[in-house]
Design a protein with these regions (language model features):
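Glycine-rich, acidic and aromatic/proline-enriched surface loops and short helix-turn segments
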Residues: 52-61, 109, 306-310, 345-348
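Conserved beta-propeller blade repeats
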Residues: 1-5, 29-33, 37-45, 50-52, ...
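Serine-hydrolase catalytic core recognition
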Residues: 1, 14, 85, 217-370
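Short loop/turn segments that connect beta-strands within beta-propeller blades
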Residues: 57-61, 106-110, 155-159, 202-205, ...
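Beta-propeller fold detector
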Residues: 64-67, 112-117, 161-166, 208-212, ...
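Structural motif
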Residues: 11-17, 50-52, 97-103, 147-152, ...
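Predominantly five- to eight-bladed beta-propeller fold
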Residues: 1-65, 250-262, 315-327
Length: 370
């Protein structure tokens, strides 16, 4: 059985972008007059694609369209085969994106049954359907329904069997579930919004920390879930990659240590100092700064400030960011020239719960930078 998503863009308006000779590579045909790149693009309020989900029975060579109760302007961000051949999981979103439905569709009868409805305030984050994983007759995904992003465990009929993680912190990644041991592997910001650590939760609900270094940790697990590669870094430590045992977190081998890189760069880079402060409205924000090496607190210095603060983003992290911006090279150079370089994660940035992240809803450009 095959399944796919079909997009009918025939009624979607065309958007046009001018193109010029000075593009790279050079567009010689636009030497005297600019050209245009035309494509289908639904701006806010314009007609969306008509979306449908189809299946193809390889044995009988029959194509069918699922009877999916999707709004005319709705979305289908994901489809997943399950272990049950009569259940194809189809994820839908309304255009407002504050309601996510997970349907179990029969590929042959085309009937669709609602399994889970996720309705939250303002919008469903991408992490909800992006984290969705299926294991036998169960599935799991990350939801912020509690006010923070946590992992939830369902059976294929849509019954919630367990909230895997709990607390006033966000789960950042769901790595997978070990069917044999009943362990859920994930990363979270439990220790600090600036840091991540790798954990697993066992059958009894007990939590076990696998990463040992303080900073930013990310993992890639083997298909057997017995081993994982842990990539650790901090503001002062380039990435260190180790192979670890998934049951104990014990390091089995160091694959990359970047020792020489650290020795060569440390004398050249300025020191990131993390800080927090409260705005005039009492909102606590996180930031970092790099000061001149001969900094004198009694003197005044010009300040260069980097700001992004897009929804769910993070620039203030205890992580090695060399090679990115703001990563350290330019900032350290400007500090050597007598500037203080600062960066602040404004309102609406990530790892601080749903209320903080979604406060910029319908206020983009207003609250992000204040």
């Amino acid at each position: 059985m095959l399944a796919w998503i079909r997009y009918d863009e025939s009624k979607v308006p065309i958007y046009s972008i001018q193109e010029f000779k000075g593009a790279y590579p050079t567009r010689q045909e636009y030497d005297e007059y600019p050209g245009a790149y035309n494509y289908k693009y639904p701006v806010a309020g314009a007609k969306n694609s008509d979306v449908s989900v189809l299946t193809f029975d390889i044995k009988n060579r029959v194509t069918r369209t699922l009877k999916l109760p999707l709004d005319s302007d709705g979305y289908v961000p994901r489809i997943h085969f399950t272990s049950d051949p009569t259940k194809l999981a189809v994820v839908t979103l309304n255009r407002h994106q504050d309601r996510m439905d997970i349907y179990m569709a029969n590929p042959r009868s085309t009937e669709c049954k609602l399994a889970v409805r996720e309705e939250v305030n303002k919008y469903v984050p991408e992490s909800a359907y992006g984290s969705l994983k299926f294991y036998g007759d169960h599935f799991a995904f990350i939801s912020d329904r509690s006010g923070y992003k946590h992992l939830y465990w369902y059976n294929l009929n849509g019954k919630l069997e367990r909230q895997v993680t709990k607390g006033n912190y966000d789960v950042s990644d769901f790595y997978g579930y070990d069917v044999k041991t009943g362990r859920f592997f994930y990363a979270s910001h439990e220790e600090s919004p600036l840091r991540t650590a790798v954990y697993y939760t066992d059958k009894s609900g007990k939590k076990h920390k696998l990463s040992t270094e303080v900073g930013t940790n990310a993992a890639t697990f083997s298909t057997s879930m017995k081993y994982f590669m842990n990539i650790y870094s901090s503001a002062t430590q380039p990435p260190v990659t180790t192979l670890r045992d998934a049951a104990s977190g014990k390091a089995l081998s160091t694959m990359v240590d970047n020792k020489e890189l650290k020795e060569n760069l440390t004398p050249l880079l300025g020191q990131k100092e993390f800080f927090t402060f409260k705005t005039s409205e009492g909102v606590e924000l996180n930031g970092w700064m790099i000061k001149p090496r001969d900094f004198d607190a009694s003197k005044k210095y010009p300040v260069i400030m980097y700001q992004y603060s897009g929804p769910g983003s993070q620039e203030v992290r205890d992580a090695w960011s060399m090679g990115f911006y703001p990563g350290g090279q330019f900032e350290s150079y400007m500090a050597q020239q007598g500037f203080i370089f600062a960066c602040v994660d404004g309102r609406g940035t990530g790892a601080r719960g749903a209320e903080f992240e979604k406060c910029t809803y319908l206020n983009l450009g207003c609250l992000l930078y204040t």
